[in-house]
């Protein structure tokens, strides 16, 4: 089975965008509950023991707010994942094309396939993050304010949240914490795409070599490579960059979960609530107040979330591409 994310893939920009958007939408809906749990754990300050682990947190949310609370903030999150997936995959495709063109003309200092996947993945991750960051911000705020120990209800809808942040902080308010997001997501996606390609190629080779053995044990020979490669790549990449994700969530909610944020909207006094846009300052605060382990709050649930997310995303991307091409082929055959 071919790897449609390889540097020499024949996939088009339209296919990348459409299949990337579908993959983002499907994966988001499946992992939304784990994302809500992760955000609650990440934003819980040291000393509070209201949420004490994945399953207890999930049970507590359902008990306090109902089952639908596990999909709280899902509308902005779905928009985030659809646009993020589409932007990420089409950017990855175009960066690969640029590097291919460079390698064809370069006499020396050519970029290796592994480095190419990392560069294309990192660029795609950074570009998609910037393009969709306001949706990520809204998703975090909606998920955070649902907590039982949070008495703030500043945000009621996408439009109301947009107006409130714009009035209080101006256009730059929609991008608070974006630097830490880029710092965390760029290497994460670079590592993800680089390792995904390697792992999938190895799994394809294994499947081809041991085809008869797999058949003899009634094991599938196709369809599992994408999900398995995505799972492995997502797990390894997430483990390396998680502290930066915690810093990003703290920057996004800092001050905005304060009762007086809404009251001070449009007034100079609001700046006292928004005293740090610096990820390094935020990292120092977390370490001083909570120790280094504060940077890893919600790590287990994030790891559990990122693995199936990556698996579902890559599987859906490859399968939706296969369906799209089958549909196009059927159309051509009917015309003929």
From Swiss-Prot:
The chain crosses the membrane at residues 17-37, 66-86, 118-138, 177-197, 228-244, 298-315. It comes from the Eukaryota. Solcar repeats lie at residues 11-98, 112-202, 221-323. Signal peptide: none annotated. Its main location: mitochondrion. Keywords: Membrane, Mitochondrion, Mitochondrion inner membrane, Repeat, Transmembrane, Transmembrane helix, Transport. It is found in: Mitochondrion inner membrane. It is a multi-pass membrane protein. The keyword Phosphoprotein does not apply. One of its GO terms (biological process) is thiamine pyrophosphate transmembrane transport. SUPFAM superfamilies: Mitochondrial carrier (SSF103506). The keyword Cytoplasm does not apply. GO terms for molecular function: thiamine transmembrane transporter activity. One of its GO terms (cellular component) is mitochondrial inner membrane. PANTHER family: SOLUTE CARRIER FAMILY 25. Belongs to the mitochondrial carrier (TC 2.A.29) family. Mitochondrial transporter that mediates uptake of thiamine pyrophosphate (ThPP) into mitochondria. This is Mitochondrial thiamine pyrophosphate carrier 1.
């Amino acid at each position: 089975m071919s790897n449609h994310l390889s540097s020499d893939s024949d996939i088009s920009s339209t296919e990348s965008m459409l299949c990337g958007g579908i993959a983002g939408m499907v994966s988001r809906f499946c992992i939304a509950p784990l994302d809500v749990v992760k955000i609650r754990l990440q934003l819980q300050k040291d000393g509070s023991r209201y949420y004490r682990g994945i399953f207890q947190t999930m049970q507590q949310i359902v008990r306090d707010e109902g089952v639908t609370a596990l999909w709280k903030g899902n509308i902005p999150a779905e928009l985030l994942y659809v646009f993020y997936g589409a932007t990420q995959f089409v950017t990855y495709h175009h960066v690969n094309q640029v590097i291919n063109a460079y390698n064809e003309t370069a006499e020396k200092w050519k970029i290796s396939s592994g480095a190419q996947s990392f560069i294309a993945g990192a660029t795609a991750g950074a570009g998609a993050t910037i393009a969709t960051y306001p949706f990520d911000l809204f998703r975090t705020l909606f998920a955070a304010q649902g907590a039982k120990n949070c008495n703030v209800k500043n945000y009621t809808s996408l439009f109301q949240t947009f107006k409130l942040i714009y009035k209080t902080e101006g256009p730059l308010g929609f991008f608070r914490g974006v630097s830490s997001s880029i710092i965390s997501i760029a290497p994460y996606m670079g590592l993800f795409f680089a390792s995904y390609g390697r792992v999938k190629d190895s799994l394809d080779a294994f499947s081809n070599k041991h085809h008869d053995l797999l058949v003899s044990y009634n094991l599938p020979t196709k369809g599992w490579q994408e999900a398995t490669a995505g799972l492995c790549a997502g797990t390894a990449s997430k483990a390396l960059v998680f502290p930066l994700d915690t810093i990003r969530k703290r920057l996004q909610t800092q001050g905005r979960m304060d009762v007086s944020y809404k009251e001070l909207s449009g007034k100079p006094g609001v700046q006292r609530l928004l005293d740090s846009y610096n990820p390094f300052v935020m990292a120092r605060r977390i370490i001083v107040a909570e120790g280094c382990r504060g940077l890893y709050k919600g790590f287990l649930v994030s790891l559990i979330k990122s693995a199936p997310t990556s698996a579902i995303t890559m599987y859906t991307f490859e399968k939706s591409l296969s369906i799209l091409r089958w549909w196009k082929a059927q159309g051509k055959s009917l015309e003929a």
